[in-house]
Swiss-Prot record:
This is Trp operon repressor homolog. Its main location: cytoplasm. GO terms for biological process: negative regulation of DNA-templated transcription; regulation of DNA-templated transcription. The lineage of its organism: Bacteria, Pseudomonadati, Chlamydiota, Chlamydiia, Chlamydiales. Homodimer. InterPro entries: Trp_repress, Trp_repress_bac, Trp_repressor/repl_initiator, TrpR-like_sf. The keyword Secreted does not apply. Residues 58-81 bind DNA. GO terms for molecular function: DNA-binding transcription factor activity; sequence-specific DNA binding. Signal peptide: none annotated. Gene3D superfamilies: TrpR-like. It is found in: Cytoplasm. The gene is trpR. Belongs to the TrpR family.
Length: 94
């Protein structure tokens, strides 16, 4: 089952990379992700961006974006394991 999940995820990523119009990408995510899942992704984006900027405390991030400290901790832990070049890319792009 794990190989099936991995190949499905890779196929999804490949499909995303083929979206040349933002509208198509929005439609694709609306097809595959529920409103709640899209909301969770948006929250994770705000958390990661705020952590990369480093200007707010975790409590301030929680208050500003209406997220839990646990969500922020998960985002922080995910950032710790990033390849330094990828982290630098994110800091420039986010």
């Amino acid at each position: 089952m794990k190989n099936q999940e991995e190949s499905g995820w890779q196929a999804f990523l490949t499909l995303c990379s083929k979206m040349q119009k933002e509208k198509f990408l929005q439609d694709l995510f609306s097809l595959f992700l529920s409103f709640s899942e899209r909301k969770d992704v948006a929250s994770r984006y705000h958390i990661i961006r705020a952590l990369l900027e480093g200007e707010l405390t975790q409590r301030e991030i929680a208050e500003k974006y209406g997220v839990s400290i646990a969500q922020i901790t998960r985002g922080s832990n995910a950032l710790k394991g990033l390849d330094p070049q990828f982290k630098e890319f994110l800091q420039k792009e986010i």
